[in-house]
Regions:
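RNA pseudouridine synthases
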Residues: 2-313
């Protein structure tokens, strides 16, 4: 049996609130409910003594989390409807709905895009991504909608991954951001890494920071509404939360994004207003350029309609 992994954390002088909430903010890999379960099992301690999920965090205190040996996750086929944009023997392009997780993970063992793909493709997916990520070449966030390409065999997976690696994939996202951008177009070029204060979040970091990765987002204004701006973003790189962090870093977070934007989110959006609209690449088998366009989903068009009405009033 493998030894248990330990996570050791020290609360800063300004740490406050419930301990389970504070720990969840420090550990990107553990949800609050998972931490509560570990506390009930006596796996979270302070100074060698077990803590309670209702305890308050103590500034300056050292906490230790003993993680049990992880149980293997095996993705199972599930008959979940898919919006298939294109499909052949080598790949499949999907229009992912908002709210769907791409692949299984602790806390999301099923109901994911991978579960749906395993059923739809009858197991014919590339194995390079491993048992829980078959066919997955790239990902988008749970609350981001839009286009994704998945590989059905290893040759297609390698060819698509190579294109992502040299940033030759065409990817355009549509978004609505808070505020009125001063220019009609521009770009954000930074390095991104984990936020040291909250491991679930990404942030702009110095180039020399541990884990720093280069990120470039180009943007142009499509429509202005005074307090909001409708934009198109073209990605050169595809880092975790890239558009969300980049737009927030210049003072224009995405509408509905309660993580990187205002706490008072827009309930009708159920998360950030971000849609992966265009996707283009060289087909691995034919070597021909193919490009796909996804119509804006209902949540996006309804919010646009509302903004247009309010702006004209």
């Amino acid at each position: 049996m493998m030894p248990m992994e330990k996570i050791e954390l020290t609360a800063g002088p300004d740490a406050s609130g419930r301990l389970d909430a504070w720990l969840a903010g420090q550990c990107a890999e553990l949800s609050r409910s998972a931490l509560q379960n570990l506390m009930e099992q006596g796996r979270v301690t302070r100074g060698g003594s077990c803590v309670n999920k209702k305890d308050k965090v103590v500034p300056g205190a050292a906490y230790c989390i003993d993680l049990p040996e992880p149980q293997p996750i095996e993705a199972q086929p599930q008959n979940i409807p898919l919006d298939v944009v294109y499909e052949d023997n080598d790949l499949i392009v999907i229009n992912k709905p908002k709210g769907m997780v791409v692949h299984p993970a602790p806390g999301n063992p099923d109901g994911t895009l991978v579960n749906a793909l395993l059923y739809h493709c009858a197991g014919q997916l590339s194995g390079i991504g491993g048992a829980i990520r078959p066919g997955i070449v790239h990902r988008i966030d749970k609350d981001t909608s839009g286009l994704l390409v998945m590989a059905k065999n290893d040759a297609a997976h390698q060819a698509l991954s190579a294109q992502f690696g040299v940033h030759s994939i065409h990817r355009v996202y549509h978004a609505i951001v808070y505020g009125n951008l001063k220019e009609d177009e521009g770009f954000v070029e930074t390095y991104l890494g984990r936020d040291p204060r909250d491991r679930k979040k990404m942030t702009v970091v110095p180039q020399e920071a541990s884990g720093a990765r280069y990120a470039y987002t180009g943007w142009r204004v499509l429509e202005r509404f005074g307090n909001f701006t409708y934009i198109a973003c073209q990605l050169k790189t595809g880092r975790t939360h890239q558009i969300r962090v980049h737009m927030a870093s210049i003072g224009h977070p995405l509408a509905g994004d309660a993580v990187y934007g205002p706490r008072s989110c827009i309930k009708s959006l159920n998360g950030q207003c971000l849609h992966a609209k265009e996707l283009g690449f060289i087909h691995p088998a034919t070597q021909q350029w193919v490009q796909f366009d996804s119509p804006l989903p209902a949540y996006f068009t309804e919010f646009l309609t509302r903004l247009r009405k309010e702006h004209r009033a």
